[in-house]
Amino acid sequence: MDWTWRILFLVAAVTDAYSQMQLVQSGAEVKKTGSSVKVSCKASGYTFTYRYLHWVRQAPGQALEWMGWITPFNGNTNYAQKFQDRVTITRDRSMSTAYMELSSLRSEDTAMYYCAR
């Protein structure tokens, strides 16, 4: 596989053992540079609209990097300046699911992407 032209997106499921709250993300993605990716995060075990939902990422050997948040109740968003022009966070209240779309992918976007409450 030619990794020069592809970007690997990995996602993880996060569980809160105390409240049985779960955030379950979509699976790994391999994308070409210049393309876009949309990752989903389905919430359960709590009222989806009551909590901010954040997206963070961690590139290999790097610290966690905050990308932005959404308020599921009204859809308000706030993005880190670094991603302002390339990231879009949305939500589907009826499905208790949030989405993070990252466009104009670069090799340095190779990372683990997490949603977090």
UniProtKB/Swiss-Prot annotation:
Residues 45-52 are annotated as: Complementarity-determining-1. Residues 70-77 are annotated as: Complementarity-determining-2. The keyword Cell membrane applies. Residues 78-115 are annotated as: Framework-3. GO terms for cellular component: extracellular region; immunoglobulin complex; plasma membrane. Disulfide bonds join 41-115. Residues 1-19 form the signal peptide. Residues 53-69 are annotated as: Framework-2. Residues 116-117 are annotated as: Complementarity-determining-3. Keywords: Adaptive immunity, Cell membrane, Disulfide bond, Immunity, Immunoglobulin, Immunoglobulin domain, Membrane, Secreted, Signal. The keyword Coiled coil does not apply. Residues 20-117 form the Ig-like domain. Its main location: secreted. SUPFAM superfamilies: Immunoglobulin. It is found in: Secreted; Cell membrane. GO terms for biological process: immunoglobulin mediated immune response. GO terms for molecular function: antigen binding. Residues 20-44 are annotated as: Framework-1. SMART domains: IGv (SM00406). V region of the variable domain of immunoglobulin heavy chains that participates in the antigen recognition. Immunoglobulins, also known as antibodies, are membrane-bound or secreted glycoproteins produced by B lymphocytes. In the recognition phase of humoral immunity, the membrane-bound immunoglobulins serve as receptors which, upon binding of a specific antigen, trigger the clonal expansion and differentiation of B lymphocytes into immunoglobulins-secreting plasma cells. Immunoglobulins are composed of two identical heavy chains and two identical light chains; disulfide-linked. This is Immunoglobulin heavy variable 1-45.
